[in-house]
């Protein structure tokens, strides 16, 4: 039965000794964000009224990293078991709400599975997430009588007969707040580990005649926890394979699904093609018929229809209108904007710069703090000199300007419409419309010149 309100407790107090890291285990990233953030996001999508995060090791770093004012931080000063962790959060439970218990190191749990668990919770009983494993060694076993769940026995406390049981406890459960507080108050640490097990509440509920409803996840990987980097890397590949499958089934062509990483959210139009070893980070939108070459990194950007990004280009916090082409080996830094049909070639870097419609910067160029008009040609080796060592200044180039190779534009400077800047020119003053500007050292010819001879 579904109650009107639900809060979530996320256990995240463990140090993660087997990670061999100074960083708290739950802050190690999967798909570009901390494991615990995946769990927080699932709780939020599920409609949690409150999320209680039980922390211990590395608490300050956790707070600095997550920066979530909506979290209720609950300190577990000593790690004395899952039951003890829940006891620390219990004072915050309302009697008339359901409490869902999750883990910060189980990052792949899905909203769909949690919703089924929530729906399955009996009135006054417990909803329990379980799985069946071919090798259940090390896990708490689900005990049943006549098909009904009666309790959970931890592996170290289990008899030989109980260790043959393949159904195991995932640790994820949901119960009413008032019931949970009552059961938590009855926990003891009379076991092989000397800890307070949350799993003991199953037997307490059964003794009261309460029903325990067991639910299985859609995929076993949803309940896989992380104790070391090997396990984390395996979950990363599982997650990425799932994302690649979703994209392929939605019409996106991934040339090699095993070599694609999604570390954020990707929205795609029709007939998008993505080559191998592409990384998508943050929030990215790809329009219709976009092509992304091998080895590219796209982060927090919008790519318009019919754009083509050639191999090994990096696009971050940029906006490309329709039919733009960039790369190979191009870099668009935050604030880069390409209007329709613009071209940025190999070894061109843009930052806080706008390249107008049909304009081109073919190669070996830096455009920073610049506003460039339509139909402009930027020659090879052009540099906008935007920084004087203390402050940044802007370069403005009008429509239909031709900038020759090896040009330096010393900002602040404005180049008028239709102007031509000869190759090798250093522009330090504004240029009027349709002017030709050149600044070169006179060329000297010396006939019969001989090179110096090396001294022996």
Curated annotation (Swiss-Prot):
Residues 1-229 are annotated as: Pyrophosphorylase. Residues 251-456 are annotated as: N-acetyltransferase. The gene is glmU. UDP-N-acetyl-alpha-D-glucosamine binds at residues 11-14, 25, 76, 81-82, 103-105, 140, 154, 169, 227, 333, 351, 366, 377. Binds 1 Mg(2+) ion per subunit. This is Bifunctional protein GlmU. Homotrimer. Residues 230-250 are annotated as: Linker.
